[in-house]
């Protein structure tokens, strides 16, 4: 009799315990992985091995390639120019990179006035850019320190004021191209002679003698 009376009470206690555990589980927030990715993407990754790529950046506006000739950055280099070869290092496991000229060994950075300059060290945040792949298959580069400021060039290949640049503007659009070095016969004035044909002395044309017509 006593055990039969205790059985309903034990069942009720067990149900209350299960309900309490379910309530605590519902109140505990699930981890936000998207926020975790954003937070980690904003930090420099010191643990993972950095990925290094080499390519050229073709400017949509100038029709030339970005080159680093020291402190000066421009988009006036021809295809295969040694100063147009860029070494791109990943900064995080996301899409942030550091861009360095292979020949000059200077990093592309952006100062507080929004001007592109070359620096020997790329450790500061103003030398980090976020790659943004656009719908038109072009790529834009937003500075990590100055959000909303993009790498951009004018039609003449001069750097444009970053504070006036926007992601949807042609001046901020680039295409990644493989670096294959200079062409064997570049279109240069002093090397035009390599395309000339070997001349030969003109030959005389012999006159064709006509046979006298027979008179009938």
Curated annotation (Swiss-Prot):
Where is it located?
A: Secreted
GO terms classed as biological process: fibroblast growth factor receptor signaling pathway; neurogenesis; positive regulation of cell population proliferation; positive regulation of MAPK cascade; regulation of cell migration
Protein name from the UniProt record: Fibroblast growth factor 17
Q: Segment Disordered: which positions?
A: 195-216
Q: What does this protein do?
A: Plays an important role in the regulation of embryonic development and as signaling molecule in the induction and patterning of the embryonic brain. Required for normal brain development.
The positions flagged as glycosylation sites are: 137
Naming one, the record's GO cellular component terms include: extracellular space
